[in-house]
Amino acid sequence: MNSAISDTLTFECETGNYHTFCPISCVAWLYQKIEDSFFLVVGTKTCGYFLQNALGVMIFAEPRYAMAELEEGDISAQLNDYQELKNICLQIKKDRNPSVIVWIGTCTTEIIKMDLEGMAPRLEAEIGIPIVVARANGLDYAFTQGEDTVLAAMAQRCPEISVASKQNQPMGSAFSQTLKVSNQQDHPPLVLFGSLPSTVASQLDLELKRQSIEVSGWLPSQRYTDLPLLGEGVHVCGVNPFLSRTATTLMRRRKCKLISAPFPIGPDGTRAWIEKICSVFGIQPQGLEERENQIWDGLKDYIDLVRGKSVFFMGDNLLEVSLARFLIRCGMVVYEIGIPYMDKRYQAAELALLQKTCQDMNVPMPRIVEKPDNYNQVQRMRELQPDLAITGMAHANPLEARGISTKWSVEFTFAQIHGFTNARDILELVTRPLRRNHSLQGLGWSSLVKEQNQLIPS
């Protein structure tokens, strides 16, 4: 990270523990994004209960994920793990015939040292379906890092651009179409990584196309069979701040060139993201300032609500720095940015933009607390009395009972917040508790908790 940033940004690390949503929840959006995939979570009943509650399973929907439930025989090594997983995968092949099966490791597989990585290649050769192994245990990873481990594993399976270009692919194949596009470009191939809804990904593609930049592919792609070509000369750029492991894999293993840019969250972040990609390719960006100003003009009704209000990030989904930067630009005061894990190299451009935003808005730099201690945070909130706390679900009700308005951080993970046009959705989420409080005050209800009754001695 740049020394200029570290001189002004204050980083602290408290407990060293993660207080976040479980990372296996990445299955919720990844199985929908990769349409020909099947996700198999290898864990205990607790993992199954969590998935059922977090993902809202419908009985007749037959979603493309399942639980391989570990029993006493598995844990005590009385059963053959390989044979058990083989039976399950054969059943998946018979029922669904996916293009890829993704094994998701959990806390239990980590504790009992289950060798999923060792079993997968053998079983893959036997059943004829690619098996990708990703560890998403809550011991080592925070909430959204589950996606990071899956994409890092999938990056290893992407075809090599130099090998594919030498082969004579038929014109109808995905590989040849990608190569055809890249040959027409006036810039090196660009691959974007990060799982976004198709509509949002299309919006970002269109914004880059307006600057004469063609996107060669996405990781993950909508189909496993359409994974992008990777290799030397391919530029990659992330859209989410929690994908540091994927970025490292793309650089070290696949020899790609990483474009270190702020993340396209909010109009300011989206503009900076596009400008950085343009600068790497030597392209002069056109009309971005007007585009950004147009979006800000459309957000005035929300900005009037949040201007001057204070917010406290407890830390959960690793989107905290980007969201804080956007809210500071909207006129809010950020007291503290709690974050479970901070890769200062991968987020260097985002941190630089945060610093610049604070200087432009003439507000003090917020503290950035990595792996925050929740008890200490509650004490700090009691002193600061922020207008809003963005927190994990576990702390929302207790904080509300103490008179602090809250917003679940998990909602920002599942909402569409990337790009120019989705900035309104971020402010819609942020202002909802503030608008609710205003409505309650209009009704004369200033407290959501009854005062404690006084006992009269008999």
Swiss-Prot record:
Keywords, alphabetical: 4Fe-4S, ATP-binding, Chlorophyll biosynthesis, Chloroplast, Iron, Iron-sulfur, Metal-binding, Nucleotide-binding, Oxidoreductase, Photosynthesis, Plastid
Enumerate the subcellular locations listed in this protein's record, separating them with semicolons: Plastid, Chloroplast
> Which reaction is catalysed here?
chlorophyllide a + oxidized 2[4Fe-4S]-[ferredoxin] + 2 ADP + 2 phosphate = protochlorophyllide a + reduced 2[4Fe-4S]-[ferredoxin] + 2 ATP + 2 H2O
Can the keyword Iron be found in this entry's annotation? Answer: yes
Q: What is its main location?
A: plastid
The record's InterPro entries line, in alphabetical order, gives: LIPOR_BchN/ChlN (IPR050293), Nase/OxRdtase_comp1 (IPR000510), Protochl_reductN (IPR005970)
Provide the cofactor list for this protein.
[4Fe-4S] cluster
Class in the EC hierarchy, top level: oxidoreductase
Pathway per its UniProt entry is: Porphyrin-containing compound metabolism; chlorophyll biosynthesis (light-independent)
Q: Which GO terms describe its cellular component?
A: chloroplast
Stored SUPFAM superfamilies: Helical backbone' metal receptor (SSF53807)
Which CDD domains has this protein been placed in? Pchlide_reductase_N
Give the co-factor note.
Answer: Binds 1 [4Fe-4S] cluster per heterodimer. The cluster is bound at the heterodimer interface by residues from both subunits.
Q: Which residues bind [4Fe-4S] cluster?
A: C22, C47, C107
> Which Pfam families does the UniProt record give?
Oxidored_nitro
Question: What EC number is given for this enzyme?
Answer: 1.3.7.7
A molecular function GO annotation:
oxidoreductase activity, acting on iron-sulfur proteins as donors
A single GO BP term for this record reads: photosynthesis, dark reaction
Say which domain of life the source belongs to.
Answer: Eukaryota
Assigned protein family: Belongs to the BchN/ChlN family.
User: What is the role of the protein in this entry?
Assistant: Component of the dark-operative protochlorophyllide reductase (DPOR) that uses Mg-ATP and reduced ferredoxin to reduce ring D of protochlorophyllide (Pchlide) to form chlorophyllide a (Chlide). This reaction is light-independent. The NB-protein (ChlN-ChlB) is the catalytic component of the complex.
Q: How is the subunit organization of this protein annotated in UniProt?
A: Protochlorophyllide reductase is composed of three subunits; ChlL, ChlN and ChlB. Forms a heterotetramer of two ChlB and two ChlN subunits.
Report the protein name in the record.
Light-independent protochlorophyllide reductase subunit N
Protein species of origin? Chaetosphaeridium globosum (Charophycean green alga)
Q: Could you tell me the gene encoding this protein?
A: chlN-1
